[in-house]
Amino acid sequence: MGGSTKQALLQALSAAEGAYISGQQLAEALGVSRAAVHKAAQTLSAQGYALDSAPRRGYRLAGGDPFCAEAVGPYPAPIHIYDTLQSSNLTAKQLALGGAPHGTLVLTAHQLAGRGRLGRRFESPAGKGVYLSLILRPTLSAADAQSATISAAVAVARAVKALCGLELGIKWVNDLYYQGRKVCGILTEAGTDMESGQLEWLVVGIGLNLTTSPADWPEELARTAGSLYPGGPAPVSRAVLAGAIARELLTLCPAFDCLDEYRARCFVPGHWVTVCTGAETYAAKALSIDDAGRLVVEREGGRQAALQHGEVSIRPTRTG
């Protein structure tokens, strides 16, 4: 029994919105035998779908959070899905080095050593978040790493709005916030040809807290980290949301033409911030996002800088 039958059955039952459909109706609609429908239903149940069957009534999809490639939905590139990984970005980079094509998606239910920017650990409790990495192979330039991160933030915000009805704000450059708490981080890494110095691929890693509860955070994150639906349940499955995010990002690549939308969602300009560049830390007024995606700030004394990298945090009050 092919994956196409499973996918078609899943789509038919999802469209029925919890109503029963008889085995005969499904067989006729899908152009397969009733035995094939039954086998597909068994496979979906084994993959985590809450599938009910009843004599003389048929089948219905009762809900659940299935985590499998079929649940991602139609997708134009290979999908690699895992129960547990050290890091989805690490696996994606290994696949990229092996020649995995543009759009390859790595999805995991749990990361043992998820990473954020500046080498920070990204907490990834099992079954409670969307943890994915996407391989991009457009015509690449050095500026594309920043553009890909910006586009990924927009892709997450679009997908969450479409499927959850929630509006996320963006904190330059790579964090998304909901109700004042960080719910998503993005890490973009690049592979370079050693001879030419040209970028060969980008791996965009996205970690979105979906149903993580306060008890899941270590103490140092408890006051700043959040999730879309703390403790659950969520109205959308992790795989469906991951697929929506990945498809949104692929539509933005390779043009990465979403800077105006990024600016509209970014809440940093207009605030006093603390800037940490690695070399120095200073207070500044965040002014705008320029056409290269850099954060333009004005230091005390009037000197302006356009930040390509670095970390900013909004200052709670402005004194002096």
Annotated model-derived regions:
Residues G2-S33, L140-L168, Y178-G320:
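Long, positively charged amphipathic alpha-helical accessory segments at protein N-termini or as interdomain linkers
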Residues G2-K161, C184:
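N-terminal lobe of the biotin/lipoate ligase/transferase fold
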Residues D52-P55, K171, I289-D290:
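Short, ordered beta-strand-loop transition motifs
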Residues D83, I170-W172:
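Short loop/edge segments at beta-strand edges and connector loops
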